Amino acid sequence: MACENLSLGRLKPCKDSVGGIKNVYFINYNDMDAITFDVTDTDVIDSIGTAVNCYKYDVHFSSSLTQNIQSSAENGTTAFEQVLELSMPRLSKEDHKEIKLISYGHPHVVVEDQNGSFFVAGLYNGMEVTGGTIVTGTAMGDMSGYTLTLTGMEKVPANFLVSTLTAAGGTIVEGV
């Protein structure tokens, strides 16, 4: 059985891309009730539903999404581990509660990178908090805040959204 179904080559891209995450949006598990994919590109999501609450966290320049390919020739399997590392300065009682709720659940997470692309991590299985810290720092210049590691495992890499989160049916909920 042949599994090689490549459809495109790849040219060397321009050097106009930057690293980093601008925002992440947490969505309660199963709130994305009507996921639809682009008819011409089934790796791209057109819609996540109607008026889906997306809780925005601003994580400029201090967070990353890494997708590790877990492939085994012996088992005939391939999966994609999605690891989201977040750093959020400043402790607050409101954030304490939300961090606790994120840790108890397994939300879907939309990642907006610094290039304006949106990815849906934990699309089917959600993302689990697998570690993190609530830290006051030691010296005056140290971070006082939260770090979180969320991990998910999916059959495919985190899908792109075809456009913005609001165009895909998300309702942005911002904090104070």
Regions found by a protein language model. Give the residues of each.
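Mixed-charge, glycine-accented linear interaction segment located at domain edges/termini
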Residues: 126-176
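Oligomerization/assembly interface segments of phage tail-like spikes and tubes
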Residues: 72-93, 142-156
